[in-house]
Amino acid sequence: MAESVYKIIELVGTSDQSWEKAAAAAVQRASESLRDLRVAEVTQMDLVLENGQVTAYRSKVKVSFKYEGG
C-alpha cells in the first residue's frame, strides 16, 4: 500500500432539526469543494437558544481528506 497524507479541517454545521442533520450539512458542504473525503468526526455539539427555546443545533466536525498538494 502506498503511503498517503491526509489533511484535517474543522467545520461547524447547523440545523433547526437535529445534531445529526447539522453534522451531515457540514459534510455535504465540504464535499462540494473537497475531493476524496475519508473520515468525519463529530467533536462537539451545542445549541443556539433564543428566549429559552432551541433555535438551532450545531455540530463541530473534523473532516479528513487525501492531501494532494505539493
Give the label of every model feature segment:
Residues 4-37:
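Short, well-ordered alpha-helical segments
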Residues 6, 37-40, 54-60:
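Short connector loops at helix/strand junctions that flank enzyme active sites
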Residues 13-15, 44, 65-67:
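Flexible glycine-/small-residue-rich
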Residues 40-48:
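Short, conserved loop-to-beta-strand elements that form functional interface hotspots
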Residues 51-70:
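C-terminal structural segments of small proteins and small subunits
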